[in-house]
Swiss-Prot record:
It comes from the Eukaryota. This is Regulator of rDNA transcription 14. Belongs to the RRT14 family. Involved in ribosome biogenesis, probably through modulation of rDNA transcription. Pfam families: RRT14. GO terms for cellular component: nucleolus. Its main location: nucleus. Keywords: Nucleus, Transcription, Transcription regulation.
């Protein structure tokens, strides 16, 4: 019988040996060491020969599970970063079009607060490209902060002016000696006529 590869030959030998071990209880044919086998095949062979204790088997399964979990977590982290990047780019595009929804404004403010310390820590960067990006981010943050400050200041001034005008209209604010629309009491026009 001709085999197409060494691995197929090793597999067929292993299956025949297993068959003999199950049929004939006294025979145990050891596989030849010349054939290469995978780590799982070696592990299964050791378990079959009962060289591993229960604790060692649990430990091996625990290590395997930890590796799988690590890969899954890395994949999830990459997906999470990608989704955040997409969300940020969408919000950035809406901001440039001045079409931000309240939820997007809230998310942007949260992102600014979250990354403010990172910008401070990254102030000493040697790479000019990264430095340019950081400077752009700083100017964007300052513009947002100044815009917020300017809007609140304008609102306060408008409210103050409105309140002052309302008080004048109601007559709450009055100056002694002045009558609305008339000259002050005791004012002589004689000095102007001379």
């Amino acid at each position: 019988m001709a085999f197409s590869s060494a691995s197929s030959k090793a597999r067929s030998k292993a299956s025949v040996n297993k068959l003999f071990e199950s049929m004939l209880p006294g025979t145990s044919l050891l596989p030849s060491s010349s054939g290469k086998s995978s780590a799982t095949e070696k592990f299964a062979a050791q378990v079959n020969k009962k060289k591993l204790t229960k604790h060692e088997i649990q430990k091996a399964h625990k290590v395997e599970k930890a590796k799988k979990n690590k890969l899954i977590n890395q994949k999830l982290e990459k997906e999470k970063k990608f989704k955040k990047l997409v969300k940020f780019n969408v919000i950035k595009a809406h901001k440039e079009e001045k079409d931000l929804t309240p939820e997007e404004q809230k998310y942007l403010k949260k992102l600014i607060k979250k990354n403010a310390n990172a910008v401070v820590r990254a102030s000493e960067v040697d790479d000019p490209f990264v430095k340019d990006e950081i400077d752009a981010l700083r100017s964007e943050i300052l513009a947002l902060t100044n815009e917020k400050y300017d809007k609140s200041r304008d609102r306060k001034l408008d409210a103050k002016l409105q309140s002052f005008n309302d008080k004048i209209k109601k007559g709450v604010l009055a100056y002694p000696g002045l009558t609305p629309g008339l000259a002050p009491v005791g004012y002589d026009d004689e000095s102007d006529e001379e």
